[in-house]
Amino acid sequence: NKYNIYFAYEDMNVVMNILKQNNAEQKNQIFDLNCQIEVLIDKRNTTKFESSIPPVSTIRIEFVGEE
């Protein structure tokens, strides 16, 4: 499954740890004041991935589609 993750630059370490824990494959990325990473998550790990996103208002995920 493909997701976009939007986050503030100061949350970079949190997001990178989440991606590492979920064996996410990074595709496109933009690192600026506001950051975006497109990732692929194995379908078997989507629930774990979605629940691992902390309830921080500066981190948001968006399901893009299946791949």
What are these regions (language model features)?
Residues 1-11:
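Short glycine-/aliphatic-rich beta-strand segments at the starts of folded cytosolic domains
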Residues 15-20, 48-57:
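Short amphipathic alpha-helices in soluble, non-transmembrane regions
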Residues 25-31, 56-67:
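Conserved short beta-strand edge segments in small beta-sheet-based binding/regulatory domains
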Residues 1-2, 22-25:
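A broad, low-specificity signal for short, low-complexity segments enriched in glycine/proline
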Residues 39-42, 46:
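Terminal, non-globular segments
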Residues 5, 37-39:
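A structural signal for short, well-ordered beta-strand segments
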